[in-house]
Design a protein with these regions (language model features):
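AAA+ P-loop NTPase nucleotide-binding core of proteostasis motors
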Residues: 2-24, 29-33, 40-79, 84-139, ...
């Protein structure tokens, strides 16, 4: 009796016994593993993303009224009521225009936003919270990495690649998303006067942003910029994408003071201005100040909503530690709770953390670094010990912070 011939996959060489299915063709066979690999290759070449179809409903837009938007933001961001109101109205108007079904001759323009405020005052957190509430794709990009087309660096179009990646390449969802451009102040042109040398990472980038902000169809490399020149491009319409820009604009308070003082007349007015300056000059910021800082008029014209964030004082920082839904102390308490340890703090510890955050000029973002420097040793040691409770005293916090490397980083 003739020996039965063993069948093999013509692609990977596996035998019939090593695979689940072996599909026969005219002159060969293919196993289920090679079929899956072939499907992946086809998807990459033809820009077919099955997961985008599978998750298409996960980014269903849910628009709320301005009061509801602010109420939601109050749960995550402490203070900054003026900024919350302005953002709530701008976001509501932006997405309301998408739902208008009656065709008429009145075209409602986009409400792109600029937020001015010191580092750690909540610009990024506000934008993140809005995107979470609306259930839309969200991408954060750093303006400092962009350069004008043709120079080393990333093209401005690459920010849309991140938006596509955030929604599994669902173009329809991405076209209703939010892009937060951080450090927008770092691409300010160097002076108001034209320069002979080309400013490829400043004014050149601002010029590149104009069409994106206004609304246009862009061919986007889905894997990002210039590293994959062979990839297929995806067409994205930015007409309904909301752009929120944030920056510290260090020194803009002097420009505001100069402008406000110029229009002040009389001794009493100047006295009141001095009181205002002692508090927060950012409340007077407008497009004129941003233009003098270095943003081009064309860019400012496409970002009509300007808001400011107040510097954080001690009471606000104290509340940030404990009050929001995802407050820092709640996060660390939960981490210890997972280990079966009940974490508690002396009230004076919170005041100590706030004092250091103000002293080191770190804002709310610095509170986490301070918490980490105080609790790192306990998070390292306690999981290996049979401890059920742990209280952070003021003496413990001072000792641990004093021996940490962070204590050496004090701002002069």
């Amino acid at each position: 009796m003739a020996k039965q011939q063993t069948l093999h996959c013509s692609f990977c060489g596996r035998s019939r016994d090593e695979v689940k299915i072996l599909i026969a063709g005219q002159e060969g066979h293919i196993c289920e593993n090679c079929v899956e690999h072939a499907q992946e290759i086809i998807g990459q070449e033809l820009m077919i993303y099955p997961e985008a179809k599978a998750t298409g409903n996960s980014h269903k837009l849910t628009v709320r009224k301005p009061i509801e938007i602010k109420k939601f933001l109050d749960e995550y961001v402490i203070g900054q009521d003026d900024a919350k109101k302005i953002l709530a109205v701008a976001v509501y108007n932006h997405y309301k225009r998408l739902n208008q079904k009656i065709e008429n001759d009145v075209e409602i323009e986009k409400s792109n936003i600029i937020m001015v405020g010191e580092t750690g005052t909540g610009k990024t957190l506000l934008a993140k919270s809005i995107a979470r509430m609306l259930n839309v794709p969200f991408a954060i990009v750093d303006a400092t990495v962009f350069t004008e087309a043709g120079y080393v660096g990333e093209d401005v179009e690459s920010m849309l690649s991140r938006l596509l990646q955030a929604c599994n390449y669902d173009v329809a969802a991405a076209e209703k998303g939010i892009v937060f451009i951080d450090e927008i102040d770092k691409i300010a042109r160097k002076s108001d006067n034209p320069s002979i040398t080309r400013d490829v990472s400043g004014e050149g980038v601002q010029q590149g942003l104009l069409k994106l902000l206004e609304g246009t169809e862009v061919l986007v490399p889905p894997q990002g910029g210039r590293k994959h020149p062979e990839q297929k491009l995806v067409k994205v319409n930015t007409q309904n994408i909301l752009f929120i820009c944030g920056g510290a604009f260090d020194g803009i308070d002097r420009l505001i003071a100069r402008r406000v003082n110029t229009h002040a007349i009389g001794f009493n007015v100047n006295k009141e201005l001095q009181e205002f300056q002692a508090k927060n000059l950012l409340q007077f910021v407008n497009a004129v100040d941003l233009k003098h800082f270095g943003l081009i008029p064309e860019l400012l014209g496409r970002m009509p909503v300007i808001t400011y964030l107040n510097p954080l004082d001690a009471p606000t920082l104290r509340n940030i530690l404990t009050e929001p839904k995802n407050a820092l102390i709640k996060q660390f308490t939960r981490l210890f709770d997972i280990e079966g340890i009940a974490l508690s703090f002396e009230p004076a510890v919170f005041d100590f953390m706030v004092e250091k955050a103000l002293e080191y000029k770190l804002g709310a973002r610095g509170l986490r670094s301070i918490c980490e420097s105080i609790l790192t040793d306990s998070m390292y040691e306690l999981p290996s010990q049979k401890v059920k409770t742990f209280e952070v005293t003021l003496d413990y916090a001072q000792r641990k912070f004093g021996t940490s490397k962070m204590s050496m980083l004090k701002v002069a």
